[in-house]
Amino acid sequence: METFGHVDWLSVTFDADFDERLIEAYVGTFKTLGAGSHGYTRRAQSKAGAVLLADGERRQGKSLTLSGTVLEGLRTILESDGPILDFISHHKGRASRLDLALDIVEATITPQSLWAEYQAGMARTSTRSNLALTSNERGVETFYIGSRQSDKFLRVYDKALEQKMDAKSWLRLELVCRRLVARSYVSSMVEQKSIRPFINRAITEFCDFPLSAEFREATAQDNADVPTLARKIPHFWRWMETQVIPAMASRQVEFPEENVLKTLTLLYHKHLEKRGRNLRPNDALLDSSE
């Protein structure tokens, strides 16, 4: 049995001023193909297959997508995903999608065997959403744990069947991460000497198959810290972050003599009282007696 862990998809947004010639050193020169989507007026593709969306509204920045094929080609030159992750971090890129793949090759483990373990209630996972896709010849060939509309879900599938390699055993576990999860994971992976333990830990924390000896062996090295994020930002904090705080910051500039932070603290206290919570010392952003 052989196992491999790697990044299999990476979508990143850079600031509008990002010099795309910097990434061309890795993926080759970009050629404009036409108009982009989602408000971008330019879509370009590099020699290696990287896709760039640019020239939209300034707040949109520039969007770069590296597919599994592009990343595989980069690994043959750079030897790992580390240099690309370092580049993204150095240039303040913000990941919007990150796929972490674990390949288990030439083993007896199959999507069907792991699905049976999951159906028997023996897999450990915090999500109840799932979907299985069946092939008449091999039973379950692909299944998903978690909603495909969420920020994180696991896809388990027969990679050999996908690649039409019938004589080979090749199982892939693919953890698809989006938005805040993707951004947090990329930031954490930059700090790792090797990303393989991080991939193992990220997968097993989301869904573990303890009865499969081959799965346990493939994910045995998992001594990495994986950040835990809230599933959804509460509406109150989203309102504070997107509307109240920017407005108060603008008011502080306009009226420097006014104690805007004190006003913000009082608003926070009212929110706690509305929820029926007793105020504690740590709940105060600023002592309201000032």
Locate predicted features:
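Structured, helix-rich domain cores that form ligand/interaction pockets
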Residues: 1-231, 239-290
